[in-house]
Amino acid sequence: MKNNRTLGLAILSLLLFIGNAPLAAKVKNYTLSSPDGGLKVEISTGDGLSYRIMHGNDTILSHSNIGLVLADGTLVGKSSRVTRERRKKIEDKVESPFYRFKEFIAACNELDLKLQGGFGVTFRAYDDGVAYRFYTTVASEVTVKDEMAEFNFPQDYTAYLPYTTNDKKPMAMAFQNVYDITPLSKAQPKLAFLPV
């Protein structure tokens, strides 16, 4: 009788484990809009971490994967389970002594997704752009070995690219150059600098 009960509990535990396994990779979508509502970011979590950017009804950037590879082999963003979601509106007054205005307001909406394992990602949607950054709450030192940042454009847009003028030391330059006007598919595999 005792063996049957133990066997029954083992089978029940296995069924519960198998039944809940798909929940770990369940895809969940989060939406964040700019203050004026013109830009929208859709963040998807589950098997991976990706985002998509919309302007009105137009897709500007198709779902693009993001993540980090740590020195110990941990993949931040892979099988991402959100443990906390926080939203806030931000209006920062930025002093700009060398700009044509003395100061300006940087307004955005922010979505902070804390991920299981002591990491998180914060997205910001401004009226004229979108940004994200990873962070950690791990107390020990963390070494990032690589970053995954895909940019999947829905079509072959025209790009205005100012390439570096120093191929041997691409960051050792005056950051001044003419713009190469080209479809994204024809962009050169070398460093281009802002503004793009």
Residue positions per predicted region:
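Bacterial N-terminal signal peptides that target proteins for export
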Residues: 1-11
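Intrinsic-disorder/low-complexity regions
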Residues: 2-3, 19, 35
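Bacterial N-terminal signal peptides
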Residues: 10-19
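Sec/Tat signal peptide C-region and signal peptidase I cleavage site
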Residues: 20-24
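N-terminal accessory beta-strand-rich subdomains and adjacent acidic, glycine-rich linkers
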Residues: 27-196
